[in-house]
């Protein structure tokens, strides 16, 4: 089964774009989809979320490493 499902990251969209509280569901999905994030970063639909200034804050709050995309 492919764990990459950007729709599951919906709980992260608000905090990624506007800041504010990060729900536990967001951290759970970021953790589950860590291997997918670089693909999203390259995508025209989702790249702005991953590259947004608030994204680093999400990873910090969730205690996850920032994805290092090549």
UniProtKB/Swiss-Prot annotation:
Transmembrane annotation, as ranges: none
One MF term in the entry's GO annotations: lipid binding
UniProt xrefs under InterPro entries: Bifun_inhib/LTP/seed_sf (IPR036312), Bifunc_inhib/LTP/seed_store (IPR016140), nsLTP2 (IPR033872)
Disulphide linkage map: 4-38, 12-26, 27-62, 36-69
Stretches assigned to coiled coil: none
UniProt-listed GO biological process terms: lipid transport
One matching Pfam family: Tryp_alpha_amyl
Keyword field: Disulfide bond, Lipid transport, Lipid-binding, Transport
Family: Belongs to the plant LTP family. B11E subfamily.
Described purpose of this protein according to its UniProt entry: Potential phospholipid transfer protein.
Record protein name field: Probable non-specific lipid-transfer protein 2
Source organism (scientific name): Zea mays
């Amino acid at each position: 089964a492919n764990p990459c499902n950007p729709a599951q990251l919906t709980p992260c969209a608000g905090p990624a774009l506007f800041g504010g509280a990060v729900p536990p569901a967001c951290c759970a999905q970021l953790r589950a989809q860590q291997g997918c994030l670089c693909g999203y970063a390259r995508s025209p639909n989702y790249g702005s979320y991953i590259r947004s200034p608030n994204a680093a804050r999400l990873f910090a709050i969730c205690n996850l490493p920032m994805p290092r995309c090549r």
